[in-house]
């Protein structure tokens, strides 16, 4: 490569032959021009970042291509063979406009296609890409907003998966930073810079990403160079001397008219004089903002020229006239024909392809001297002219619904058409604008306009996006992200522009930047969009923040959504949209008030909602922009709006498009909050705004292609106003009533299958289950969409009307879900009351297909026999949605049995169970079971074991978290009159063991979750696995309450000694589950310690402050299990169940009155004051005490003591 880059004369033109052989075919010329030759070493022979400032038309695109080839040279072998590995080195090309992206796409597909380079367009016009196509692409061409939107999905959704392969970023028209849209460009470049610094990217191409930025002439190119870390050799600045054609620029200012529309029309009267003065008989392009404006300008010039007769300045010869006359006859557009014969034409998207080709050919040949066109031609086909006239610097923005200034890049692009290098050595640019904006365009054309950052006004939205993508996870990274922005560069150079004092010291300036960052984070945290720790250091995204990023909403709009009521109606949500920041540009004009007042009066009763005053009556006068938006939205949603004004129509369309996006965000937010009424309302409003129809509109058929308001009215007159009536109507009748020709009726009816199949809802009450009504909701597909490949989606929502809670929600594919599809819900019902269950199937796209059903759950004699769950319940009207358990299946039903217990509880206690997933043996893996309890037939088997020395007490204080597996111990005792008598005597120091009062009233379930640790330990978690019924054996440890002479009896009832194995068994009744577990439950003082699992101990607080619980699972075959056993040959201690893989002696927590005894390390639930202790240590203490008593304990060892214990 070095040989290829032989320098020679630094001022000589570089030859294409200096490139490797595989790359030479990319260029259709032999030599690079002077600008390209000067940049050749930096572009192709190095990997430095670059910023190039040069006039339009000087050949900057070739510099991009040289940098692309430099990257591709990594795939060249030593023999100059090109071996591309697709998608491994990506180039991102970012341009301000879609037209420019599409122009470069066509150009590079032709030039680089022979090398096998895969180019992908990523704009709003092209949605036909997916994750795979992005990963396989070598060159991605996109706009800033689209790339920001795609990458905002983040690591979570794979949106940033391709970032590691980015090796080259090409930024066209980087002066876009000065436009309001520049914030998106600044954000994505900062994002790339942040990700490139991650340690995980060290070996990825992104770690050494290269930035190449080009722009028109700007004065502060050094600031952009500092932002992109461009070294001095990478900064290239070129003046007007690099233009192949010298340009003369003129900016004319005119007095404003009554409105922007009339101002643009008035400029047409000045165009002819300007062309006569500056065009001098040469070709001219007149750029107009709209298609109609281009056509009217051409007609005005044509009429003026025709009035001059033979003195027509646009007609040079009779031969030219004959050519134009023949060409006009080939055009289908009559207005175009009339203009062409006078040497004037117009070009816009409204012409057919043939007419546009004719016009382009005539202009290139010189037969047409004047061509009026829209601004899209500035980025389309190359039609240069000597003179360029920009008629008005404003255009009508469809999204905003008003006239706005052209972006600077657009103006420069149009100016770039001036001057034709092969034919002219000069060119002229004329800009016609308002008087107050003349200086802006003079500075722009002269390269005197400073490029400032536009990030600060929307910094909170972009910072939230970074937090959602996990690129910013703490406050230091947030500050680092801000320092990666162009804002940080400019705020140091021009602090006054950003509201900071000019003479502020550098240290205070840094603090000011940090304060800005902290302020934005505080705002996000205040409204629940992100989570921060107590110190405000750690940052984590929350669902509302993710939704704001996903739907590209402004922060002010998201604040309105977060503050919305949980029971919003359609009217409430429509008011939120009217106040949203996305449409704040819509203003109320004086000449619109009369029409808006008439619409709000609504004498025909068309509107669903009206603007009302404080007295609740309709307002007679519309006074604010929000009221205007509300009226326009309601008028549009009738399906037959009264508004026909062009400007109001544009605003109406913008309200619907932006409002639909806001409503979709509200839909997902209210689903997340489980607010049933607001969620249903937002689902309906989103698709109504999309279709511009209320669900009860008589013009629902407008949703079908080919049916407009006129056809819909004709069908309604004939009684065909719904999809059902259209399906049954005769095709010939449809054609007759609409006045359309065959086969219109068949064509319309053929679209019906694309709406989706018919679905039926069935709600079945399957009885009561532990204080809950078992409801089975079944969806059945009644028809199949035949001949339609379109995929339709619907939301299935089950909600409770009384507590406004979503009990179940799922998005389904209407053509593909397994029919019948059943969902089982266990719905709590208050005593002597009714609970209303609502089931809705809301189709995502089409209005008028939704299904709604209601079911009333009623229980007259309501009581709960057992408490299942982890906490005391609330009545239904206060019950959270999580209390409703769901079992979702396709055709099977749950076979679990119900309790027949005899222990009733208070009526105000309802069943609450945690959701979890479990696979039953008789169910498919795909079936989802969300159950909260395990039931048993024989409640008598759960009775408490009898102990001679124990007495029952009422269990008054129910603990919040209990053990999960039932173990009752049958304890036997056997003693010898040996040294162990001393141990018995010592045991008198231990408190009595007593059964809790709760044993005769209720059984509390415990949740058990296996938590892997390095020591094969297990921890308790109340939100995991099954909630089992248990009968806890409560050993209440208090001061000794029995006399010494009954101690032996107590030991005989508790301890059983087996001589052969020297082991003692605690046995209990096992449950039907085959697993085995032991749980030791102890409470010392007010600190409770919980250890649970297959090997676990749990300590919990009881009314007597100190009690010991032994619980375990029951074996389904023998109803017995050994809770603790000793293996003589291994001399090791083990718990039945899962053994330690190393066969080491298990350490476990053992109850002791000694304050310095330490339990084993466990999960976070364990009290911090308790420390680990092994059973060996405990036995050693007993043995030492026994030997010191002088009772002949020399033959004992630790193992024998343990066998006794």
Swiss-Prot record:
Q: What is its main location?
A: nucleus
Q: Which regions are flagged for Polar residues bias?
A: 1075-1091
Q: What InterPro entries does the record tag this protein with?
A: DEAD/DEAH_box_helicase_dom (IPR011545), Helicase_ATP-bd (IPR014001), Helicase_C-like (IPR001650), Meiotic_Crossover_Helicase (IPR052247), P-loop_NTPase (IPR027417), Sec63-dom (IPR004179), WH-like_DNA-bd_sf (IPR036388)
**Residues spanned by motif DEAH box:** 172-175
Gene behind the chain: MER3
Recorded GO molecular functions are: ATP binding; ATP hydrolysis activity; DNA binding; helicase activity
UniProt keyword terms in alphabetical order: ATP-binding, Chromosome, DNA-binding, Helicase, Hydrolase, Isomerase, Meiosis, Nucleotide-binding, Nucleus
Question: What PANTHER family does the annotation carry?
Answer: HELICASE FOR MEIOSIS 1, HFM1, ATP DEPENDENT DNA HELICASE HOMOLOG
UniProt lists the family membership as follows: Belongs to the helicase family. SKI2 subfamily.
Query: What function does the entry list?
Result: DNA helicase required for crossover formation, complete synapsis of homologous chromosomes and bivalent formation during meiosis. Is specific to recombination events resulting in interference-sensitive crossovers (class I meiotic crossover). Works cooperatively with ZIP4 to promote crossovers.
Recorded catalytic reaction(s): these are:
Couples ATP hydrolysis with the unwinding of duplex DNA by translocating in the 3'-5' direction; ATP + H2O = ADP + phosphate + H(+)
Q: If you read the UniProt record, what top EC class would you report for this enzyme, in one word?
A: isomerase
Where ATP binds, per the record, is at 54-61
One GO CC annotation: chromosome
For region Disordered, the annotated ranges are 1075-1131
Species the sequence originates in: Oryza sativa subsp. japonica
User: What residues does the SEC63 domain cover?
Assistant: 541-852
Protein name in UniProt:
ATP-dependent DNA helicase MER3 homolog
Q: What does the record note as the disruption phenotype of the gene behind this chain?
A: Complete loss of fertility due to defect in meiosis. Normal vegetative growth, pollen viability is severely reduced, male meiosis I is defective.
- Ranges for domain Helicase ATP-binding come to 41-236
Q: Where located?
A: Nucleus; Chromosome
Q: Which residues form the signal peptide?
A: none
**Tissue specificity of this protein:** Transcribed preferentially in early stages of meiocyte development and during meiosis in young flowers.
The biological processes this protein is annotated with in GO are:
reciprocal meiotic recombination
